[in-house]
Amino acid sequence: MSDKIMLLDGHSLLNRAFYGLPDLTNAEGKHTNAVLGFLNIMLRYVEEEKPTHLLVAFDRKEPTFRHIKYKEYKGTRKPMPAELHEQVPLMKEVLKTMEIPIITQAGIEADDILGTIGKEAEEAGFDVAIVSGDRDLLQLATKKVKVKIPKTKASGTVTEDYYEDDVRELYGVSPTEFIDMKGLMGDASDNIPGVPGIGEKTAAKIIKEYHSIENAHDHIEEIKPARAKNNLQEYYEQAIMSKDLATIKKDCDLSYDFKDAKIGTLFTKEAYQLFKELELKSLFKYFDEEEKEEETLEVVTTSDLGEVENLFSSIKKSGQAGLGVIGVSGNCKGISLTWKEGTVLALIGGFVTEDYLKEKIVELLKEGTELIVLDYKALLHFVEKVREYESQIQDVGIQAYLLNPLQSAYDYEDIARDYLRQMLPSRKEICGKKAIEEVFEAEEEKTVQMAAYLSYVPFHAYPLVFEKLKEQEMEELYLTIERPTVATLYEMEKYGITVEKDALKEYGDQLIGRIEELEQNIYEKAGKTFNINSPKQLGVILFEDLKMPFAKKTKMGYSTNADILEKLAPDYPIVSEILEYRQLTKLKSTYADGLAAFIQEDGKIHSIFHQKVTATGRLSSSDPNLQNIPIRMPLGRAIRKVFVPDPGYVFVSADYSQIELRVLAHMAGDEHLIDAYRHGEDIHRMTASQVFGVPFEEVTPLLRRSAKAVNFGIVYGISAFGLSQDLKISRKEASEYINKYFATYPGIKTYLDGNVAFAKKEGYVKTLYGRIRPIPELSSSNFMQRSFGERVAMNSSIQGTAADIIKIAMVRVSKRLQEENLESRLILQIHDELLIETKENERKEVRKILEEEMMGAAQLKVPLSIDIEEGKTWYEAK
C-alpha cells in the first residue's frame, strides 16, 4: 500500500469554516469558530483518507506574480473580517502544536504550493488528496491526485471528490482543459475578466469541442453562438491572460521535505494545552489520558460520624467554606465541602443522615461561617432554614451571570474555565442524562470528582469573581436585588399553582373541536385533503393549485412561514384559517396536552424559575414555561381559566402599567413625556395626536393602537421597515412616523443615540441599577449583526431596568406578606405581573401591599402605576 499525502488549502478552508459555524469565543474573547471548523474538517478527512503525510499551505500578504501581471487581480475582494483575520495566526499556532508543517512562500499563492507539491508527490509514488473550497484546484486532478471540495448543504457538510475522470464527467473537459474554461468564463471571486458574455455552459461547450482557447480562436468562424464568436475574437488577448492567471503553477522552487510531513502524534501535550486555552472542548476526545495530564482533585470521602464532626469543627474555625449538595432532598448522597484545608465529601451512612447534614449546615451559619455555593436556590430546596442567614451565603453562579449574562450556563465547569483556567468534565459528560444521585454508587470514582467540584469550584473562584463584580460596580446590584430574589423564586417554586384537571380537559376538547372545524374548512377551500402540517404540501396547495402571490421557493419547497401567510391572510380566507389552525395546534400540544404532564401529586404545577438565562435580567421559567402563555387570541387567553387558587383563596393580580415607557421617560429625561405621565395623560392617545397630526379628542381607537405600536416599537429600537410591517404601511410612512415621534419627544432621540454611542465605545450598556449588558455584535464586521447590536443598545437599558424594578417589587411584596403574618403568597411573576394567591379575608391588605411595594419599588421622575384585578381563576384576575 503506497503512502498518501493530504494537502490542505489553509485560507480557503479557514474561510469556509468561519462562515459555516456561528461565532465562538473563549473566556478571553478570542474568536475560535474558524479554528474549530478547520480542525473538524481536517480531522474528518484524516479519519476518512488515512493519510501518512499531511501539510497545510497558506497565502501570504505580499503581492504575487499574478498581481504583477494584472494589477486588478483579486481587486474586488472585500477585506477579511477582523474576526477571521485574528484566527489565521491562531490556526498556524494550533497546527504547529500538532506538528503539522505549514508552507508559505512570497510571490506565489497557496494554490501554487499545492500544485507543485501535489505533482512532486505523485511523481514520488504518493497517492494525493488535495482539500480546498476553491474549485480552481480541479485542474490539479489526475488519476492519482484527488481534489476534495467540502460543501455546505442543508444536511450538513458534504464532500465532492474529483479525480481526472470526475472532472471530465462533470464538465466534459479534462482538468488541463478546465483552465481554458476558466480563461473564457473568468472568475469573479478572483477578478479574472475572461470573455464578456461567455459563461460556464458556453465555455465548457467551446473547450469540449476545441480543447483550448488557442485552438478555438484558430477556428473562430465555427464558434457558436455568434455573440461568443465575436466576443472571443475581440477579447482573445484578455482570454489568454485570464487563462494564464487561472493556471496553477506546478514547478515552484519550494524548500520542504516529504519526511517533515509524515504524520506523528498530532494530539500532543502542547496541542492539548492550546485546545484548553481556546476551549475547544469537543476535540478533547482525540487526546489520550497521558497527553491530558489532568490533575485529579484530592478528595477525602467519609461517613464516619467522628470524622464528619471534626470536619465541621475545622470549617467553623476557618469561617468560610464552599458547599455543594450531592443529589436532591429525599435522595441525597451527601454534601461536598471545600475549605482552606482541602475538599471532603460527607456521605450519608450510619449516623450521618440527611437531617443531620442539614442541621450541621445551619449550625455553620449560626456560628457565622460564610458558605459559598453555585446555586443558592438549589440549597434552599435542600434546607430551607438557610434563608435566615442569607447575608452569609454567596451564590457564585449569579455573580458570574452578572459579569457575563450572554453565556448559556454557569455550572462548575463554566466557572472553572472562566475564572480558574481549568477545563473540567461537565455533569453531562459524567452522568449523561441521569442525575448525580442515580450514578453515584455505580461510578463512584468519576462522580466523587464531580461532587468535589460542586464545592471546590465556587470556593476557589469566589474571591476572583466577587472582586471582578466590585470592579464592575455590580456588588450593590447583587446584594440588594439578585441575591434576595433567589428566596422569592424558591417560595414561588415551592407553593406552585393549582391546575384544575377537568377544566384543562375541557379546554383541550374545545381546541380539538375548533381544530377539526378548521381542518374541514381548509380542505373544502383547497378542494382536496392534505397534510396541513407539511410545509411542502401546503406550499403546493397555496402557490400551485390556488395560484397565490408572494411565492418564495427554496430548496425544500415553497416557504409558508408566518410572514408570508400574514401577507396573504387579508385576501384569502383559507390562509387566515391556516394561521388559526397553526396557533390552535400549538396551544393544544404546548398547553392542553403539555401542562397535564407537569401536574404533581398535590394537583399543582411547580414551574422552575430561572434567574440566569436572559441577557437583560428578565426572569424566565420552564417545566412548564409559564412566561409564554398567550394573551392575544381568545382561546390563548382561555388557558388561564384552568389555573385556580386553593379553597378559601382568590387570585389578586397586579400588573405594571407601561413600565418600560415610564423607565424610558425617566432615563431619557424627556420633559414632554415626563410631564404627560405626571399629569396622568393617555400617552398612546397623546402620541397619536402628535405623530398623526390629529386633534387629541379626534384620535380613534385604531389610531391609538397604531401609536401604541410606535411607542413600544421605539423602546425596542424598531426600524422603519419593522414599523411598516407592524402597521401594514409603506416604509416611507413608517419613517415619517418615527421622525415625528422623535420631534415630539426629542429627549428620547438624544438618549437612544447616546446609548448606541456609549455601547460602541465601551462594548456594553448599563441599567439604572448598574446591570451590564455586553453587546459584542457592535464590533462585528457583519452589517446585520452591527444593526442588531444598535437595537440592543437602544433597548437593553430600558428592559433591564424594568426587570430590576419587578425583582425589587417581588422581594418587597413577598417580605411584607411574611412580615405581616398573612397566609397569602406570591406564586407567579409573568413579565410585569405579580399573581398573589390571596386568602379571601386578606384581600384588602394584599391590595394595599401591592400598591405600596410595587409603586414604591423605584423612585423615578414619573410615578409607577399598577392595575389590580382579582378573580377565582387566573383568567378572571387578568
Language model features: what each stretch is:
Residues 2, 22-26, 75-251:
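Extended two-metal-dependent nuclease catalytic cores across DNA- and RNA-processing enzymes
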Residues 5-6, 10, 16-55, 71-72, ...:
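Conserved RNase H-like, two-metal-ion catalytic cores of nucleic-acid enzymes
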Residues 154-182, 299, 336-470, 481, ...:
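Active-site-proximal helix-loop-helix substrate-binding element of RNase H-like nuclease domains
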Residues 231, 235-351, 371-374, 434-631, ...:
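Conserved "right-hand" nucleotidyltransferase catalytic core of DNA-directed polymerases
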Residues 336-341, 403-434, 450-457, 611-695:
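Function-dense linear segments that define catalytic or interfacial modules
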Residues 438, 494, 606-607, 611-614, ...:
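Conserved catalytic core of nucleic-acid polymerases
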Residues 469-481, 485, 805, 809-830, ...:
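Active-site palm subdomain of RNA-directed nucleic acid polymerases
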Residues 513-520, 524-576, 743-791, 795, ...:
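C-terminal polymerase-core module
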